[in-house]
């Protein structure tokens, strides 16, 4: 399904890494990633977060102090299993910074709408007052350490080169219970010529 640009912006769009990203001559930072674009302008560039790189056990590489720092005092370090499911590596830029996505616009003021049922940022103080959101059975919150960024015209050049496949964003993939398969899920839902790519093995030699 092609993406229709609104006001010449890719905000709210998924960038699905094409197999071009697996070429030897390209840095492999974004191999099999899905990036949600949070900001985009032809004049200033783009900012997004990788939605399918959960920290998992790697969350242990971040000290309790560091986690508290990036969450501005929200103590999420008591339950490592829980934290490992909601913390993601958002990208290679400013990995000591925090971006968070949620569906809590009713309780978090100043949230920025990304699309109809997904919001970014807002006042973390309000989140502290609603600890129950961390215990919700349904995923409604994700934290991303770092982000992906492109200078003016850079992303457009990568798209033209075929490095990215554009897909309309949706919250189901952002909050997928199996983020490790989001790349495959995104391609499969695209259908047509993209669906077969979702079955392409990471190492064709061993297939």
Predicted feature locations:
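A short aromatic-anchored loop/beta-hairpin motif
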Residues: 1-144, 148-207
């Amino acid at each position: 399904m092609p993406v229709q640009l609104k006001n010449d912006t890719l905000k709210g769009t998924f960038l699905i890494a094409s197999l071009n990203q697996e070429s030897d001559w390209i840095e492999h930072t974004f191999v099999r990633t899905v990036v949600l674009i949070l900001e985009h302008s032809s004049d200033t560039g783009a900012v997004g977060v990788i939605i399918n790189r959960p920290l998992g056990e790697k969350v242990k590489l971040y000290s309790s102090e560091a986690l508290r720092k990036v969450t501005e005092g929200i103590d999420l370090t008591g339950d490592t299993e829980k934290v490992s499911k909601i913390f993601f590596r958002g990208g290679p830029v400013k990995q000591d910074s925090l971006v968070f996505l949620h569906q809590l616009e009713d309780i978090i003021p100043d949230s920025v709408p990304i699309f109809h049922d997904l919001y970014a940022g807002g006042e973390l103080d309000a989140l502290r007052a609603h600890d129950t959101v961390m215990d919700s059975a349904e995923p409604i919150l994700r934290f991303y350490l770092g982000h992906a960024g492109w200078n003016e015209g850079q992303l457009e050049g990568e798209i033209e080169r075929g490095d990215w496949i554009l897909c309309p964003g949706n919250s189901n993939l952002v909050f997928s219970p199996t983020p490790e398969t989001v790349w495959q899920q995104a391609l499969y839902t695209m259908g047509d010529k993209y669906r077969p790519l979702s079955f392409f093995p990471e190492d064709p030699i061993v297939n």
